[in-house]
Amino acid sequence: MRQFLFLISVLFANTIFSNITVYFNYGVFSTSSNKPYLETYLTISGNTVKFSPVSGGYQANVNISWKILKGKDIVKDSKYNLMSPIATDTLHLPSFIDNQRFSLDNGQYTLELIVTDNTNPEKKSIHVEKINIALNRDKKVYNSDIQILESFTKSANQSLLTKNGYDLIPYNIN
């Protein structure tokens, strides 16, 4: 009986700790030329991915795979590696963020997101969500979504986090 309970607890623990913790959020915005786009925000919990030794400390490396489908057709897709900041202390592993923008027309979409730890490929997180892009261009005034920020600073260089001359760090953990 003890062996059975031990086996069940090991399998249960393995299931719990096998996924990467990813916080996902998005907003729908309009460009200055009134074209809608989807902006995505990811926060990857540093203590759920493997940090490997690199020059100057330890770093995690994850693969991000996006697919945006309209019906069964792939409208946008992207696959890239995202590196964490370098950590000098493995007791305090930093979370890290990603921000992407996808130009889309009005319509119903399905977003598929897969985040895989490149150091431990069995460890992954999968998210699928329906997204509605509906900006009415016939109206003179309409709303985009709002972006909740953790912080912002005047931008020294243009990056994925830059909007109108400021680096906007999204607050993504609710």
Language model feature labels by segment:
Residues 3-13:
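Sec-dependent N-terminal signal peptides
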Residues 17-174:
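Intrinsically disordered, low-complexity terminal regions enriched in Ser/Thr/Pro/Gly
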